[in-house]
Amino acid sequence: MKYRLIVALAMLVLSLPSQAERIKDIANVQGVRSNQLIGYGLVVGLPGTGEKTNYTEQTFTTMLKNFGINLPDNFRPKIKNVAVVAVHADMPAFIKPGQQLDVTVSSLGEAKSLRGGTLLQTFLKGVDGNVYAIAQGSLVVSGFSAEGLDGSKVIQNTPTVGRIPNGAIVERSVATPFSSGDYLTFNLRRADFSTAQRMADAINDLLGPDMARPLDATSVQVSAPRDVSQRVSFLATLENLDVIPAEESAKVIVNSRTGTIVVGQHVKLLPAAVTHGGLTVTIAEATQVSQPNALANGETVVTANTTIGVNESDRRMFMFSPGTTLDELVRAVNLVGAAPSDVLAILEALKVAGALHGELIII
């Protein structure tokens, strides 16, 4: 029943006609993007839920040296309230120095929980190695863990990952090509030649001929003013322009782990017959030992006794006529009571046989 509901909902969604969407909802401006930042730091103040790994001690010792505290070479600090963590954040486009970012903090070692901890000053670097933000602050951890003396343990959610809202201050901005050049380029989130052409046509209808041209299935190039203030208002007008996206190509998407199957609107089948059923073969091996009388001159003989059982379940066959559509396909699959795993095997066989007109995608 659950499987039928999933397929029915997918059928309803994918069979809806294409509606006009704003350019800002289906495309991004090239060069206007976020950047990922990452850092390595220490969380302190943990209530005995930290770690004692070698790299934690080394990082802790290095931090003390930076504050002018030198420990003996053979001294190993006993720390239970410290954890080594990875800190990462997304830096949106156009963000300026002084603005703040949310950061996520994740334990790298054996720490049992980060609840109650405080992240010390951590440099967040970009892919180019430059520092773009500095993070510090108290963690918000939704999970928790508790452990008894007998080894019993209770864990809820993930206590080794936390967040710091507005926990990083931006120190350097990232340059974008938005304000340079004679063109702006829109990149479709889903590549499609028809949608790219329709977007260019809609922009040309608004601005005039030859103002926009599709470069490929993803990109549409638009002539833009050089003045930055004019470019902002120009883009604000374009991103709210309505475009009717092209209909999706025929696809069948199957999640082999969860059994979810989504069938696109234009999936059709050529004439085919499918048999649904199962064949169970049971092979049992039993060993028999023949032990002769102690006074006889015989030898002990070991023989194998093999029993093979075959159990064939009821087979059901259904046929598809030419041009069978989504509705008939789903109805026929439900009629034979096929489970999602069975449907996956049926779809793969139909694709190999050339009877399935559509792209079969297994994720």
Curated annotation (Swiss-Prot):
Alphabetical GO biological process terms: bacterial-type flagellum-dependent cell motility
Query: Where does it reside?
Result: Periplasm; Bacterial flagellum basal body
Task: Report if keyword Signal is assigned.
Answer: yes
Q: Which UniProt keywords apply?
A: Bacterial flagellum, Periplasm, Signal
GO MF annotation: an example: structural molecule activity
Keyword presence, Signal: yes
Q: What is this protein for, i.e. what is its function?
A: Assembles around the rod to form the L-ring and probably protects the motor/basal body from shearing forces during rotation.
Family, similarity comment: Belongs to the FlgI family.
Q: Which HAMAP family match?
A: FlgI
Q: How does it assemble?
A: The basal body constitutes a major portion of the flagellar organelle and consists of four rings (L,P,S, and M) mounted on a central rod.
| The protein, known as | Flagellar P-ring protein
Q: What is the lineage of its organism?
A: Bacteria, Pseudomonadati, Pseudomonadota, Gammaproteobacteria, Alteromonadales
Q: Which gene encodes it?
A: flgI
